[in-house]
């Protein structure tokens, strides 16, 4: 089967899908919180911003 080679090229005007592997449509920060929570790890937060997704650094 023959087809034009141009069909394999991407258009420069075509927007890049930034979070292609992000199935839940989360931004990178939300995705990181989700992954760290799933791994049982939490980020360090500065009080009074401490909550369930992080632990207090100070």
UniProtKB/Swiss-Prot annotation:
Disulfide bonds: 44-56, 45-54, 50-57
Origin superkingdom: Eukaryota
Database matches in Pfam families: Conotoxin (PF02950)
Propeptide: 13-41
Tissue: Expressed by the venom duct.
N-terminal signal peptide: 1-12
Domain comment quoted from the record: The cysteine framework is III (CC-C-C-CC).
Family (UniProt): Belongs to the conotoxin M superfamily.
Protein name: Conotoxin Pu3.6
Taxonomic source organism: Conus pulicarius
